[in-house]
Structure formats: C-alpha cells, structure tokens
Regions:
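Metal-dependent polysaccharide deacetylase catalytic core of the NodB/CE4 family, i.e.
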Residues: 1-45, 55, 68-75
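A sequence-composition feature that detects small, non-aromatic residues
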Residues: 19-22, 57, 97-99, 136
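Glycine-centered structural positions embedded in regular secondary structure
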Residues: 26, 57, 118-120
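Glycine-enriched alpha-helix->loop->beta-strand junction motifs that scaffold or abut catalytic
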Residues: 50-56
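Beta->alpha turn/N-cap motifs
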Residues: 60-61
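Terminal accessory/targeting
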Residues: 78-164
C-alpha cells in the first residue's frame, strides 16, 4: 500500500475504494475498520477515511486505548520480528493508557521545522519520561498541575520521528 501522506486526496480516495472492492470481491466482506498504511495519518486523511464510511481507524503509535481517544486515530502496538519478544508483550499487558488532552500540535504529520510539543494529562507528571526515536536531545517541562511540554534542543531530522 502507498503511504497516504504522500498522495493527493483524490489518489487516497481512489486507492481506498480500490482496496475495498478487492476485499469485497475476494472475501465477500465490507469492513468499517481501517488501518493506515505504515501506521501514519494526519487530520486530512482522517476526514477522508471517515467520509468513506469507516467507523474507526488504527494508526501506529503505541498506547492503550482510553475513553475519549480519537476513534479515527486509535493506537496499536507493533508485533513483529523486532518488537515481538515475550518480555515486551508482558510489559504491554501490564501497562496502562496515558490519556492526554490539549495536545499540540494537533496534527501528527508536521511538514515544517518545529521545536516541540505538549499535552495535558491527569497522570502524575513526575512519573512521565519522554524520549525521541532518533536520540535528538530534548528538554521536558512539567507545568503544574497537569501540563507537560517538550522542547527539542537540536534540529530534528527529516523523515519519521517519534516521541515516546
């Protein structure tokens, strides 16, 4: 499948409809559940997917689902050769969702150089640690009572970047 973030809206609609026709033909089944190719979505893609009749959609950021989650961008955990060890599976089973709100930036795909992000949560701020997937140095600010802001201390690289 193509990465939807690299396609025009018309191409996205065409590809999804084509895939649905293939599923219907081969499985005699219509699904109202969508999984973003490569696990990547943005606000515009989410609107398109919803307009095509999908009830929920899965992205690929790791978290448990919590009440109030964006149902067009639900998290899922990767399980494959690299991320499929039993110890990791046990850790996931024992962990809990980090419910967040007032997230900035609102979109998950950022096409410009930005210096940070933030969110609010009802969890204890001192129990939260943040890391960048490409070892970019960052600074975390805990703003009482429930706000966490992250600032990058060096430029982020082009391409896929994740904060965990």
């Amino acid at each position: 499948h193509s990465n939807l973030n690299k396609l025009s809206n018309n191409e996205i609609i065409y590809k999804i409809k084509k895939a649905n026709k293939s599923i219907q033909k081969n499985l005699n089944f219509n699904s109202d559940i969508f999984s973003y190719p490569y696990g990547e979505s943005n606000l515009e893609n989410e609107k398109i997917v919803k307009s095509l009749g999908f009830r929920i959609a899965f992205s690929q950021h790791s978290n448990h689902i919590y009440r109030g989650e964006n149902i067009m961008r639900l998290p899922r955990f990767s399980f494959n050769e690299e991320f499929g060890k039993l110890d990791r599976f046990k850790m996931i089973l024992e962990s809990k969702a980090l419910a967040v709100y007032d997230v900035i930036p609102k979109d998950t795909i950022i096409n410009s150089s930005f210096i940070g992000m933030g969110f609010s949560t009802n969890h204890k701020l001192n129990s939260i640690n943040c890391f960048h997937s490409n070892s970019v140095k960052l600074e975390t600010f805990r703003i009482p009572p429930n706000r966490l802001e992250i600032r990058f201390l060096e430029p982020i690289k082009k391409g896929r970047n994740r904060i965990t």
